[in-house]
Amino acid sequence: MATDAQMAQVAELEVEMMSDMYRRMTNSCQAKCIATAFRESELTKGEAVCLDRCVAKYLDVHEKLGKRLTSMSQGDEAALQKIAQQ
């Protein structure tokens, strides 16, 4: 059973990973969608649409990777349990 310290460490790692993903997504989508020479104080419609699509794709890929890694991890755990039973 996981201790409170272990649970706190897991929660801290999750926050760190989400912060890193947000930072990378922000940097990537801003570089892709927003010109470096600002001509207007507000986002143009094209920039807003580009950012929306970029963020949606980034989150979709992040979710798919998370599901895939979870299924791989569960498969590894099952294999280890089989080996331990032998």
Swiss-Prot record:
Compartments where found: Mitochondrion inner membrane
Record GO terms (molecular function): metal ion binding
Loss of function: phenotype: Worms a small body size, reduced number of progeny produced and partial embryonic lethality due to defects in import of proteins into mitochondria.
Gene Ontology cellular component list: mitochondrial inner membrane
Keyword Nuclease in record: no
UniProt cross-references to SUPFAM superfamilies, sorted A to Z: Tim10-like
Disulfide bonds listed in the record: C29-C54, C33-C50
Top-level taxon in the UniProt lineage: Eukaryota
Membrane topology recorded in Swiss-Prot or TrEMBL: Peripheral membrane protein
Leader peptide range in chain numbering: none
Similarity annotation: Belongs to the small Tim family.
Subunit structure, as described in the record: Heterohexamer; composed of 3 copies of tim-9/tin-9.1 and 3 copies of tim-10/tin-10, named soluble 70 kDa complex. The complex associates with the tim-22 component of the TIM22 complex. Interacts with multi-pass transmembrane proteins in transit.
Protein's name according to its UniProt entry: Mitochondrial import inner membrane translocase subunit Tim10
Organism: Caenorhabditis elegans
Lineage, opening ranks: Eukaryota, Metazoa, Ecdysozoa, Nematoda, Chromadorea
